[in-house]
UniProtKB/Swiss-Prot annotation:
The keyword Transport does not apply. Belongs to the bacterial ribosomal protein bS21 family. Keywords: Ribonucleoprotein, Ribosomal protein. GO terms for molecular function: structural constituent of ribosome. Residues 34-57 are annotated as: Disordered. Residues 43-57 have a biased composition (Basic residues). One of its GO terms (cellular component) is ribosome. One of its GO terms (biological process) is translation. This is Small ribosomal subunit protein bS21. The keyword Iron does not apply. Signal peptide: none annotated. Gene3D superfamilies: Ribosomal protein S8 (1.20.5.1150).
Length: 57
């Protein structure tokens, strides 16, 4: 998890904006959304194969 420290003379909005940027760059939220629900390995394999087929077209 990214950590953000207040800089001297920085407003809360600027610090929050910097924190949000660091979180999006690190991919923490994307991974949390991806792991929100359990997906069986067989379903993961089907999805992977489906994506590969669509990318070949």
């Amino acid at each position: 998890m990214p950590k953000t420290v207040f800089r001297k003379g920085e407003t809360i909005e600027e610090t929050l904006r910097r924190f949000k940027r660091e979180v999006s760059k690190s991919g923490v939220l994307a991974e949390a959304r991806r792991k929100e629900h359990y997906i069986k390995p067989s379903v993961q394999k089907k999805n992977r194969q489906k994506n590969m087929r669509s990318k070949k077209r």
